[in-house]
């Protein structure tokens, strides 16, 4: 949690993909609240750091948060720091500085897994998108992502407040009925169903062990993100807690935070 909060309070622009696996309805809204709080803190920190020392900030960088799942129903996350081409290289790149091409940024992408042992056998997002082996080898060979340690006092206060917010949300998650944790790994019991569909085929993941996963034929990440949709059902939250909405349907979006 401290690693995620330090990334969210970093001074770089952040791209958040609204996808969260194996979560209950109340923790889904908690993550929305956390992203709203972290967006304001990241905007303030980026403006203050650029005014003080602009050479320490990587130009036109972003972090792409993608959530996937493993065969043992334990979610792990992919953190991909993406970097646009330098605007001072050519005049044509200055015109295209507002557009973030994911396929052209794969040379600067890094991969960080919370369960690295399950990477070869798990259906990761790279395997689902049918990326070539050269790009997969490039992502696996890149070094781990390092967070900038030079932060001002306002950045440290924002990161500490985010850590307190995470602890408070975890405390509420334990107290509110409907969520259960295992004593060994502190993993929340899956209580929602995630459905993601593309133009050619669909990807499904639920709490049952017999869930089947089919890989889409599209190899473009932008086309897949633009066509995703999710459905969260609150029927398995418990008898003592009833949600006024039976299901929530929406579309995935990509939002750039910061300058």
UniProtKB/Swiss-Prot annotation:
It is a multi-pass membrane protein. Coiled coil: none annotated. The keyword Membrane applies. GO terms for cellular component: membrane. It is found in: Membrane. Almost completely overlaps SPT6. This is Putative uncharacterized protein YGR115C. The lineage of its organism: Eukaryota, Fungi, Dikarya, Ascomycota, Saccharomycotina.
């Amino acid at each position: 949690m401290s690693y995620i909060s330090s990334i969210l309070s970093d001074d770089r622009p952040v791209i958040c993909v609204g996808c969260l696996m194996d979560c209950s309805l109340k923790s889904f809204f908690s993550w929305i609240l956390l992203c709203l709080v972290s967006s304001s803190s990241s905007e303030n920190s980026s403006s203050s750091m650029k005014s003080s020392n602009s050479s320490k900030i990587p130009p036109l960088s972003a972090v792409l948060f993608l959530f996937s799942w493993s065969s043992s129903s334990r979610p792990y996350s992919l953190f991909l720091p993406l970097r646009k081409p330098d605007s001072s290289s050519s005049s044509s790149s200055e015109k295209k500085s507002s557009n973030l091409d994911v396929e052209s940024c794969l040379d600067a992408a890094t991969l960080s897994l919370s369960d690295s042992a399950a990477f070869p056998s798990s259906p990761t997002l790279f395997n689902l998108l049918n990326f070539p082996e050269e790009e997969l080898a490039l992502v696996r060979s890149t070094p781990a992502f390092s967070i900038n340690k030079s932060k001002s006092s306002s950045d440290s206060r924002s990161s500490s407040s985010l850590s307190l917010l995470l602890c408070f949300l975890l405390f509420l998650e334990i107290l509110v009925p409907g969520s259960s944790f295992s004593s060994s790994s502190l993993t929340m019991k899956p209580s929602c169903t995630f459905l993601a569909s593309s133009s050619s085929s669909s990807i499904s993941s639920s709490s049952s062990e017999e869930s089947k996963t089919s890989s889409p034929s599209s190899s473009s990440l932008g086309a897949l993100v633009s066509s995703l949709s999710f459905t969260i059902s609150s029927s398995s939250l418990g008898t003592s807690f009833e949600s006024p909405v039976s299901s929530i349907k929406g579309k995935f979006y990509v939002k750039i935070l910061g300058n």
